[in-house]
Amino acid sequence: MQLSIRMQAVADMVTPGGKVADVGTDHGYVPIYLIEQNKAFHAIAMDVRKGPLARAGENIVRFGCSGRIETRLSDGLERLEPNEADTVIIAGMGGLLTVRILEAGLEVLK
């Protein structure tokens, strides 16, 4: 999996070996890359829109990551439980939306 320079920079910041939640996953490429590179042993790909989440699911299957990446329809962090992820990725969104997601998900992030 080849990532864009921007998404590669995001993936490079992930501490290896944990569980990753990708908020606003869109195509699912970052969690797929992290699984392929063994930087994560499990990932949750989340998106608020059904269409992008369906495409992410198709990509997850196509790249052979079905057993290690699950998809969730979620507005921000609302479908993530405490301790389900060591790392949360929120990338490609505006600052105000990112702040709203973080504020709404404070209990999950503690």
Where do the PLM segments sit?
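S-adenosyl-L-methionine
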Residues: 54-83
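Short SAM/SAH-binding signature in class I
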Residues: 85-92
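A short, conserved alpha-helix within the catalytic core of class I
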Residues: 96-105
